[in-house]
C-alpha cells in the first residue's frame, strides 16, 4: 500500500493536471468570438442574439444580447389594455427590455457604434435594443416616491383585472425620471373574475421584495 506521503504527492499531481486543463478550457472559451446577428435561441416572447464584438467591450470574449420582440406579443389583448392604461409607457414598459450586455449602457448608446450594431442586428432589433435604456433597481433601497409610484402601478393593474405574476426582478428604473417601470409580461394575465388569490400573490411579492431604503 502506498505511503501517506506518496498518496499526497499523487493527489497534488492530479490536481495540478486538472487545474491546467481547466485553465486551458477557460482560455479557449474566452477566445471564441461572436459573429453578431445570428439568432441562437427563441422563446415565446423573446430571442437570444449572438454577441457583437464592439471595440469598447472587446476585452472579453463578447456578449450575448437578449432582446424581446416588438411585434409578437405574448397576449395581444393584454398589450392593448396596457397601452390604453399607459400610452407613454411611464409605468409599464412593453418589450423595450434592456440588453443583457453592456451595450445597453448610456455611454455605449451615445457613440457611433450604435449605427453599426443596428446595421449588424437589423433595424427592428437594433431599434428595440437602444430605444429604452433602463437601469437595474435596488429593491431594498427605494426612495419613498419610487415605492409609492410602484405601489400605484400595481394598484392600477389590479383595478383593471391584470396580475403580473412575476414582479421581483422585473422592475427597472428609468434613468431620466428615476421612476420604476414594470417589465416582462410573460406571466401576466387578465382575469375577468375577481381573482383575489393571484392579486394577493402580487401584493405579497411587492411587500416582501421592495423596501424603502
Feature-to-residue mapping (PLM):
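Catalytic toxin/effector domains delivered as secreted proteins or via bacterial secretion systems
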Residues: 65-66, 77, 94, 116-118, ...
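Conserved kinase catalytic-core helix
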Residues: 83-86, 135-181
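Conserved structural core of kinase catalytic domains
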Residues: 89-147
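Polar, enzyme-active/binding microenvironments
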Residues: 43, 151, 185
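ATP-binding glycine-rich loop module of kinase domains
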Residues: 37-93, 104
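C-lobe/activation-segment region of protein kinase-like
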Residues: 146, 159, 163, 174-213
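Arg/Lys-rich, intrinsically disordered low-complexity tails that mediate electrostatic binding
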Residues: 1-36
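Feature marks short, surface-exposed loop/turn motifs that line or immediately flank catalytic pockets
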Residues: 71, 137-140, 189
Amino acid at each position: 500500500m502506498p505511503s501517506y506521503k506518496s498518496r499526497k504527492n499523487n493527489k497534488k499531481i492530479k490536481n495540478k493536471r486538472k487545474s491546467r486543463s481547466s485553465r486551458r478550457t477557460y482560455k479557449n472559451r474566452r477566445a471564441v468570438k461572436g459573429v453578431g446577428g445570428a439568432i441562437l435561441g427563441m422563446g415565446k416572447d423573446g430571442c437570444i442574439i449572438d454577441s457583437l464584438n464592439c471595440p469598447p467591450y472587446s476585452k472579453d470574449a463578447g456578449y450575448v444580447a437578449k432582446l424581446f420582440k416588438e411585434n409578437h406579443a405574448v397576449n395581444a389583448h393584454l398589450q392593448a389594455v396596457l397601452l390604453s392604461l399607459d400610452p407613454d409607457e411611464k409605468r409599464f414598459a412593453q418589450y423595450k427590455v434592456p440588453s443583457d450586455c453592456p451595450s445597453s449602457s448610456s455611454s455605449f448608446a451615445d457613440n457611433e457604434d450604435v449605427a453599426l450594431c443596428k446595421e449588424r442586428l437589423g433595424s427592428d432589433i437594433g431599434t428595440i435594443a437602444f430605444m429604452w435604456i433602463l437601469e437595474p433597481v435596488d429593491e431594498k433601497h427605494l426612495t419613498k416616491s419610487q415605492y409609492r409610484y410602484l405601489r400605484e402601478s400595481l394598484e392600477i393593474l389590479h383595478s383593471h383585472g391584470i396580475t403580473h405574476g412575476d414582479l421581483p426582478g422585473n422592475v427597472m428604473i428609468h434613468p431620466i425620471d428615476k421612476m420604476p417601470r414594470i417589465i416582462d409580461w410573460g406571466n401576466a394575465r387578465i382575469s375577468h373574475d375577481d381573482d383575489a388569490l393571484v392579486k394577493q400573490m402580487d401584493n405579497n411579492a411587492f411587500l416582501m421584495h421592495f423596501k424603502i431604503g
